[in-house]
Curated annotation (Swiss-Prot):
The keyword ATP-binding does not apply. GO terms for molecular function: toxin activity. Expressed by the venom duct. Keywords: Disulfide bond, Neurotoxin, Secreted, Signal, Toxin. This is Conotoxin Cal14.14. The cysteine framework is XIV (C-C-C-C). Probable neurotoxin. Residues 1-20 form the signal peptide.
Length: 55
């Protein structure tokens, strides 16, 4: 019974870590997409990074 509890806790921890890494990855990807679109419309990179980190 104790082993099962330890296993479940470990499993849940791994799942939550994977989920947060995944969502952080999605946010980073969205930010770089934003910067690329912004630069393409003629702004400089510094302005775009500031603009995209605010949204």
């Amino acid at each position: 019974m104790f082993r099962l509890g330890v296993f479940l806790l470990t499993f849940l921890l791994l799942v939550s870590m994977a989920t947060s890494e995944y969502s952080r990855g999605r946010i980073m990807a969205r930010a770089s997409e934003c910067v690329n679109e912004c630069v393409e419309s003629g702004h400089n990179t510094f302005h775009c990074e500031r603009h995209c980190s605010n949204t």
